[in-house]
Regions:
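Conserved alpha/beta enzyme-core scaffold
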Residues: 1-501
Length: 501
């Protein structure tokens, strides 16, 4: 049979004020693209006519400008989870306009199944192809796995965007598998990075499908900034640390799978590892595969890669599709509850590497908020990996804003990963190995190896004035560097004596 075809505007007109919408995708890749471009226009028109119009948006991870950015600018988002990297969304959230839950990405599907977000009125998913059965639709996903099997099963209605920008052979990259809910859950049978345990397609109750929007729209993912001397040095520091750990016997000689977060720093780490002849051929078990991974897969430095999203440039995506016979044997796209599963991460011994906004001298880490209050992005999947990884590494530049902000501080203004979950901190200055060390030894390691030289005397001074205890802190001066930045615009102007009067 053939399902009803709709224009994007017709599809947007079927969405109601206060609807909760679940979306495919994970990062900008794999998200529906046509319907939301019309929905944001509709929201503006509704508001201009004096009528309310807002929706809740539930996804696997971040999405795109045409979803989060334009909808936030149209004041059309009532609730959002679990993650965002969009500037417009961030601005409106920090103005208090959007109710945003920053949540571990690996938890999203099961929280939906447990009903924590209420009913899903509509699921909108992107496919490269589909089999239009009378009772069951087999939907072949594009460049991301996300939370699709869960949202199409739970949603009252399903809208499909068939995007012919993607090759129909994208199906050969997917391993679609939904975890059973407690108390009927069984072990996830992934024993190796490349294991396939599910199907190439998501199954949808055909009676729920209200229509199909056909389009040909490229992905919105962009290339990251080119590496500079600072990010390159951080990458080399991570690579040197891992090689040293392998020589010490802490890492097996065959190496272990790597997870790396998203962004320029993560690419720098992968570049350094890929180029270093002392690092064996390795595998990647992560949530997002970027261009660097594809490059080193082609060169034979990366054997297998598993992810929830192929977040690469459109040129690289085309390369993957054009060489699908190779990549279908070495690259797997999973649901985020499998890519980010604590069970699988621990079983495989994944080495976790993610980016921090700031770390304090005792090893606590902040991924999400500036000076405690202002949302930057969110935790994403970092904690899924860092809490369960074989080794948990955070990287950050030692300073930002031309040296006015130190990423190493006495106390984090917001904590996402605690000192109990952080094994290693890396900046361009060096590496602090926190394993097997108490608070004071950790503090000295971080100050001397990771802090910028401009800030080391200040941080040493803080240790002297902090009240004695297992983990010395001064409640009056712990956030003095942040307070000074807010008042004077430069943490280097901090005078602890002003806070001890």
């Amino acid at each position: 049979m053939s399902y009803t075809r709709l224009s994007a505007a017709e599809a947007a007109a079927m969405i109601n004020d206060q609807d909760t919408i679940g979306l495919s995708g994970f990062t900008p890749n794999g998200v529906p693209k046509a319907t939301f471009r019309e929905l944001s226009k509709r929201a503006v028109a509704e508001h201009e006519a004096g009528r309310p119009f807002q929706v809740g948006i539930l996804t696997g991870a971040s999405t795109s400008q045409s979803i989060e950015g334009d909808m936030a600018a149209a004041h059309a988002i009532k609730f959002r989870a679990p993650f965002s990297t969009n500037r417009d969304f961030r601005n409106h959230t920090n103005l208090g306009e959007i109710d945003y839950e920053d949540m571990h990405l690996g938890h999203m599907a099961e929280r939906l199944r447990r009903g924590f977000y209420g009913d899903i009125d509509l699921a909108i998913i992107e496919v490269s192809d589909m089999e239009e059965g009378e009772n069951i639709c087999k939907a072949f996903l594009t460049s991301a796995g996300g939370i699709v099997p869960t949202i199409v099963r739970l949603a009252k209605k399903v809208l499909i965007e068939k995007n012919t920008f993607h090759s129909s052979e994208s199906r050969f990259l997917h391993d679609v598998y939904e975890i059973a809910e407690c108390p009927f859950r069984t072990p996830i049978p992934i024993m190796n990075v490349g294991d396939r345990i599910g199907k190439e397609y998501a199954e949808i109750d055909a009676h729920k499908i209200i229509g199909v929007v056909e389009c040909c729209i490229p992905e919105e993912a962009r290339a990251f900034k080119p590496l500079d001397s600072v990010t390159e040095q951080m990458g080399h520091n991570v690579a040197d640390f891992l090689i040293s750990d392998m020589k010490k016997g802490h890492i097996p000689p065959q190496f272990l799978p790597l997870q790396s977060g998203v962004g320029t720093t993560s690419n720098a780490v992968l570049e350094a590892l890929g180029q270093n002849p002392n690092v064996p051929v390795f595998s990647v078990y992560t949530e997002v595969v970027q261009d660097a991974v594809v490059k080193y897969m082609r060169e034979g430095r990366i054997k297998d890669a598993s992810c929830s999203s192929l977040t690469v440039t459109n040129d690289t995506l085309k390369e993957v599709y054009d060489d699908i016979d190779y990549f279908k044997k070495h690259l797997t796209i999973r649901q985020s509850e499998n890519s980010n599963s604590p069970e699988v991460i621990r079983r495989l011994g994944v080495i976790a590497m993610n980016t921090a906004i700031e770390c304090d001298i005792y090893g606590n880490e902040n991924s999400s908020h500036i000076c405690g209050s202002k949302l930057m992005n969110g935790i994403g999947g970092s904690c899924d990996y860092e809490r369960n990884g074989y080794i948990s590494i955070f990287t950050t530049q030692s300073t930002t804003k031309n040296g006015c902000i130190s990423a190493i501080v006495p106390m984090c203004s917001h904590v996402d990963s605690t000192e109990h979950d952080v094994d290693v901190i890396v900046t361009e200055q060096g590496v602090a190995d926190l394993r097997g060390k108490g608070p004071l030894r950790r503090a000295k390691e971080i100050i001397e190896n990771c802090a910028h030289p401009d800030y080391r005397p200040m941080l040493r001074e803080y240790l002297k004035i902090a009240e004695k205890g297992h983990e010395p802190q001064s409640m009056r001066a712990a956030l003095a560097m942040h307070d000074t930045f807010l008042k004077k615009g430069d943490m280097r102007l901090t005078d602890f004596s002003e806070y001890l009067k």
